[in-house]
Amino acid sequence: MIDKLEAIEKKYEEVSKQIVDPSIMADMKQYASLNKTYKELSKIVDVYTVYKSNLANLESAKTLLSIEKDAAFRDLAKEEIDSLELQKTQLEEDLKFLLLPKDPNDSKNVILEIRAGTGGDEAGIFAGDLFRMYSRFAEKMQWKLSIIEEVESTSGGYKEIICSIAGEGAYGMLKYESGVHRVQRVPATETQGRIHTSAASVVVLPEMDEVEVDLDMNDIRKDTFCSSGPGGQSVNTTYSAIRLTHIPTGIVVSCQDEKSQIKNLEKALKVLRARLYEQELKKQQDAIGAERRSMVKSGDRSDKIRTYNFPQGRVTDHRIGYTIHNLPAVMDGAVGDLIEALQLADNAERLQQGA
């Protein structure tokens, strides 16, 4: 571990010099890339600096104990050694965590897809509630949310809604949300007060750059049509809506949110690239084998990951057995504690696998 940390410290020193080079500062793309590297390395180097100081202090305390004759000073030295040993253990754990391989997609923007599942009209309403929850969370994080495609349900909410979320670390936080979300509550139309259970599925994909997904436009059939509103009525007399069909895989993507056909095409291509990436990633994960897959983020769309129990006012994430007894706040976008708990569980799992 020390050799790796020394190499990181050396790299950090090199980047520190490069980042103040006027020629690099003039190239915004290169400067942004270096600045990102600098921030990532500094997190590790800062802890490593404290760790080296701890080792030096520990060595001094042990030396003092070996030569000191006075009982009072020896007791002080022993206390300091005990304290420094505890700090050393904690710092080593922190460094192990910081050295864990990072998901290269964590810094990417997100394609978020929410679809009503079982439960009829109530499932559509719940899909709308989930969209609002993520929208409010995006606001709190100062991320930008843009709707790509929406199909409203007859009783409010959505049969399906797809959007992009742009912001620092968006995928790294939202990737744990993929799966089936279940709701238990009394619908507004229920006269006997019976609790109904319905569900909605959430898919979170990293938004991929053109260079990261090999997309041959010759493999894509493009259809244009007039955008439509609820019930199918036309809301636009121009053929601005886009439907893309990826012929080799059969994946179909539509976008009609923008008035411009070009903008709809750009958004649809983003979704298509993300879905193709997901398909390729699933092949790789299947090849790895079930025993090495993460329980926290398996990525399986059929996994029932969370229950929102309205009568009891609680939200439970079944992957880690974590419950929050403040459902109204969660539905208003306060999902940070849930995500943090999932991140901690994921990191602990990866540390154990690497042990």
UniProtKB/Swiss-Prot annotation:
Protein's cellular compartments? Cytoplasm
Q: What is its main location?
A: cytoplasm
Query: Where is the chain membrane-spanning?
Result: none
Q: Where are residues bearing N5-methylglutamine located in the sequence?
A: 233
Family classification? Belongs to the prokaryotic/mitochondrial release factor family.
Described purpose of this protein according to its UniProt entry: Peptide chain release factor 1 directs the termination of translation in response to the peptide chain termination codons UAG and UAA.
Q: State the protein's name.
A: Peptide chain release factor 1
Q: Tell me the gene name.
A: prfA
